[in-house]
Design a protein with these regions (language model features):
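Helix N-cap at the start of a conserved alpha-helix in ABC-type nucleotide-binding domains
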Residues: 159-161
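Conserved ABC transporter NBD signature motif
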Residues: 56-67, 71
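Catalytic Walker B motif of ABC-type/P-loop ATPase nucleotide-binding domains
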Residues: 148-152
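ABC-family P-loop ATPase nucleotide-binding domains
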Residues: 80-135
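Helix-to-loop junction immediately C-terminal to a conserved catalytic motif
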Residues: 48
Length: 224
């Protein structure tokens, strides 16, 4: 379980995240929804331990996450613009990641590359944006990390690829209890995969509830 308790973060005296409290249950898909600038990326970076909250606490399965390698081993963070080593190919990334994540699923990794049509020896910097996002997702899924943090991960993927990734998510959740946390500005994009959503606006949580409960509400909530 991921617990955020009253976390706050500012940049240049402007609050990007303001007193946010959210609980993310294991083996569910949690959608963090909000317009650009709502604070989604900042929240994910604090969960990943990249940024430290000015106030509040974040715990991963009861462990504080910032500067805590035991907690960070449970996480894999995919940024909006995924980072890869200069001039690397997919094989280079696999060799590096298995040194960080000992349970990295090597065979699955290469099978996914074939299924998604990604050349393992081609330089990643020659991939399209969508191909880089596919590779980042494959790396995250195969890492064996319990919590997969995805920042606008489905943006740039065509519908067929999105459906393929969603199917893999479902399989990994059933097989090993993986818990995806997906930040997006588009609720409609996630409504067929998320179990629970948190709506962010101007750095604060407007709403956090099960998606089915939200659908039953008479009021239609839409993020544009």
């Amino acid at each position: 379980m991921i617990e955020l308790r009253n976390i706050t973060k500012s940049f240049d005296k402007m609050k990007a995240v303001d007193n946010v409290s959210v609980t993310i249950r294991e083996n569910t898909v949690f959608g963090l929804i909000g317009t650009n600038g709502a604070g989604k990326s900042t929240v994910l970076r604090m969960i990943a331990g990249v940024l430290e909250p000015e106030q509040g606490e974040i715990a991963i399965d009861g462990l504080p996450v910032f500067d805590n390698m035991d907690a960070k081993k449970k996480l894999y963070f995919i940024a909006d613009e995924p980072y890869f080593f200069a001039n690397c190919n997919a094989v280079d990334m696999q060799k590096y990641l298995i040194s960080v994540y000992p349970e990295f699923a090597v065979e699955d990794f290469y099978n996914y590359l074939v299924n998604f049509g990604l050349d393992k020896k081609r330089k990643v910097n020659t991939y399209s944006k969508g191909m880089r996002k596919q590779l980042a997702l494959i790396c995250g899924i195969c890492s064996g990390a319990k919590y997969l943090l995805c920042d606008e991960t489905f943006d740039g993927l065509d519908p067929v690829m999105r459906q393929g990734i969603k199917s893999i998510f479902a399989s990994e959740m059933e097989r090993r209890g993986m818990t995806p946390v997906i930040a997006s500005h588009n609720l409609r994009e996630l409504e067929d995969i998320c179990d629970h959503v948190g709506l962010l606006h101007k750095g604060g949580v407007l709403l956090s509830k099960d998606l089915e409960d939200m659908k039953c509400n008479i009021q239609k909530i839409q993020c544009v």
